Amino acid sequence: MKLHELKPAEGSRKSRKRIGRGTGSGLGRNAGKGEKGQKARAGGGVRIGFEGGQMPLYRRVPKRGFTNIFAKQYSELNVERLNIFEDGTEITPELLIEKRMIRKSKDGLKILGNGELQKKLTVKAVKFTKAAAQKIEAAGGKVEVI
């Protein structure tokens, strides 16, 4: 077999749907658009959310809440994910970004307490949950708020 002899597997590629090319093709005449009406016209159709003139759902439902522009955006990481590091490693946000465990965040790193930690680590972060701090210290590690 040569490169120019390669062909896709039988039935793996569908042929293009050629519409409006005569009645014999099976997709002639109305070209799959049914009879007359807005949806049969070129460029026809209604915008998203339009309900035929009835007040649409997105306008019937009341507005609620707001976005707090002062909300802190932390990168969050559970303690169980720190088990990949060797004993005695100093965990910093920079190290975690380098290892692609977190993305760079606006307001720093927050360590959450889900899972178990078996390694003795020094963890530096902006915030820790109570459970996370307890688990790090129980494993013989240190918690440092930066």
From Swiss-Prot:
Lineage of producing organism: Bacteria, Bacillati, Bacillota, Clostridia, Eubacteriales
GO cellular component term of the entry, any: cytosolic large ribosomal subunit
Family affiliation: Belongs to the universal ribosomal protein uL15 family.
Pfam families to which the protein is assigned, alphabetical: Ribosomal_L27A
Residue ranges of coiled coil: none
Species annotation: Clostridium kluyveri (strain ATCC 8527 / DSM 555 / NBRC 12016 / NCIMB 10680 / K1)
Function as written in the Swiss-Prot or TrEMBL entry: Binds to the 23S rRNA.
Protein keywords: Ribonucleoprotein, Ribosomal protein, RNA-binding, rRNA-binding
UniProt cross-references to InterPro entries, sorted A to Z: Ribosomal_uL15, Ribosomal_uL15/eL18, Ribosomal_uL15/eL18_sf, Ribosomal_uL15_bac-type, Ribosomal_uL15_CS
Subunit-level organization: Part of the 50S ribosomal subunit.
GO BP terms in the entry: translation
Protein name as catalogued: Large ribosomal subunit protein uL15
Bias type Basic and acidic residues, positions: 1-13
PROSITE patterns assigned: RIBOSOMAL_L15
Sample GO molecular function, one term: structural constituent of ribosome
Listed Gly residues bias regions: 21-31
Region annotated Disordered, chain positions: 1-47
